[in-house]
Amino acid sequence: SIIITVEVGPRIISYCLNGHENMLLEDVGREFKDDSQELRDYFGEGRTWYIYGGHRLWSSPESYPHSYVPDNEPVEYTVSGGEITLIPPATRTGQQHRLIYRLADEGSEVELFHEIRNVSGAIVTLAPWALTVCAAGGVEIFPQSQADNGLLSNRRNVFWSYSDISDD
């Protein structure tokens, strides 16, 4: 099963085999948030950024507070067959996100399409960055490339200084 938020976000907030535990983090208690003065100065008083968890579309390069757009408003969406299109409000930073999630006719596969449009009128350099926040203590398996690239790498992993990938 898959659960997607439309009252905020959007986020894929739950992804699991029916009757099994959610593989994604769902921050129900809103423990992970940013309501710093710097964020409020930029986005407005009363604005708070919540991680919410799950899978979301972000932009790179990351910068503070610009990247931490409080996406706490309802999302425009349409459903057609096994496909949902989600369009949140344009951000103060001039980004218009569009996400399309397509469910396979059979099995548990979900195709994700992400798009960021620059609606600011300014020239902006960025890249779409899809983040998936997994639940602590779980095991995730990611398909690995089998491409024969000779002496060149065929897979890449990126970790931030605060990432902990230990099995402890």
Predicted regions located by residue number:
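Surface-exposed acidic/polar loop and edge beta-strand patches at domain peripheries
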Residues: 1-111, 115, 119-168
